[in-house]
Amino acid sequence: MAEIAPSGTGLPAPRYGGRPTMKDVAARAEVGLKTVSRVVNGEPGVSPDTERRVRDAITALGFRRNDSARVLRKGRTGSVGLVLEDLADPFYAPLSRAVEEVARIHGALLINGSSAEDPARERELVLALCARRVDGLVIVPAGEDHRYLEPELAAGVATVFVDRPPGSLAADLVLTDSFGGARSGVAHLVAHGHRRIGIIGDHPGIHTAAERLRGYRAAMADAELPVRESWVALGDTAPERVAADATRMVTGERPVTALFTGNNRVTVTVVRVLAQLARPVALVGFDDFELADLLSPPVTVVAQDPGRLGRDAAALLFRRLDGAGEPPRRVTLPTRLVPRGSGELPPYDGE
């Protein structure tokens, strides 16, 4: 068996299991609990010699103040929960970071969790966070029925939904104008001469995907253009599925001359498919993504601001925690069309 040598740092040895308490500090310094409390909280009324003994005891024991107990006495835990679809998704990274920054400004700790687009997992995470007495929640919903949250809202847990609306629950909501953004993106392709335009997106049961499909259909109707069902492909975002649908649409006797993609993951796969074609196909994607401006051609996108989604959702959450009592609010953020080249290509067959 290997021998473990002392670290030689001069610091107190690690103490696993029970943490030192104020009572331990008081016993070592030979003072009362109230005296330790005054030193820990920076209150007056302690002599320099006594304060030195208390601080020496704190250092020797490795004592840390229990902030959880302190904030609980104020009626809050000083923590908020964030439940996302997937923490690894590039779209959610700036959203999560923005929520964390606002929480930090308000002296709160953020606890993250991923639902993996699974309603059961979402509910499990949310209720686990509530059981740990978080002050509030920011949720990107995976499910369509959020009545399970009614007791938590009634108990005072502030809750803001972001990116997608909750189901069967009146609550604050911050989302992007997916319908308007998709409509403008497809209209941009129409303005550059395209008449056969396909859409590839996420599962139609997801609110954002459904709204972007609705925007696509509205833009086609605005231009009095037909929509063949073979031009519409919504489903999971697995590269195999997306690549198969993209290949099908851009080949054959009457291929589409342009594609509108419903999110950044779909766009990346479609870019790979189009790079293998002998002819150009115009492309506009919903969501910007890293290096989109460096591709050939650079990818035209309908950009949203996930950082602002997170900031606005967190700001609304802390307004509620500070006592704002107005009815549930719905905040819709605009999108921005970013022309870069791929969306400005003319139809290859000159129609």
What positions do the PLM features span?
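Amphipathic helical "hinge" segments at domain boundaries
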Residues: 63-128, 132-136, 213-217
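Short beta-strand segments enriched in small/hydrophobic residues
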Residues: 28, 33-38, 72-88, 188, ...
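Short catalytic-loop micro-motif centered on adjacent basic/acidic residues
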Residues: 111-113, 138-139, 199, 303
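Short hydrophobic/charged patches on amphipathic alpha-helices used for structural packing
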Residues: 69, 123-126, 149, 186, ...
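N-terminal helix-turn-helix DNA-binding module of bacterial transcription factors
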Residues: 1-78
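Bacterial carbohydrate/catabolite-sensing allosteric modules
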Residues: 1-15, 60, 101-106, 154-161, ...
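Short beta->alpha connector loops
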Residues: 116-119, 140-145, 264-265
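Acidic, Gly/Pro-rich loop/turn segments at junctions of secondary structure
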Residues: 136-149, 161-170
